[in-house]
């Protein structure tokens, strides 16, 4: 399972869905441009 947009995440263990990235300073999955 991957983390969806806006979900809380850990930047050191990024489990966000493809196309998303865990923001290191706000700890939620955002669009990876």
Curated annotation (Swiss-Prot):
One Pfam family of this chain: Toxin_12
Principal cellular location given in the protein's record: secreted
Organism of this sequence: Bumba pulcherrimaklaasi
Tissue: Expressed by the venom gland.
InterPro entries: Huwentoxin-1
A GO CC term attached to the entry: extracellular region
UniProt protein name: Mu-theraphotoxin-Ep1a
GO MF assignments: ion channel inhibitor activity; sodium channel regulator activity; toxin activity
UniProt keywords, alphabetically: Disulfide bond, Ion channel impairing toxin, Knottin, Neurotoxin, Secreted, Toxin, Voltage-gated sodium channel impairing toxin
Location relative to the cell: Secreted
Family: Belongs to the neurotoxin 10 (Hwtx-1) family. 22 (Htx-4) subfamily.
Functional description taken from the UniProt entry: Voltage-gated sodium channel Nav1.7/SCN9A inhibitor.
Disulfide bond residue pairs: 2-17, 9-22, 16-29
């Amino acid at each position: 399972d991957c983390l969806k947009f806006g979900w809380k995440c850990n930047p050191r263990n990024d489990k966000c869905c493809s196309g998303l990235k865990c923001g290191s300073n706000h700890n939620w999955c955002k669009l990876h441009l």
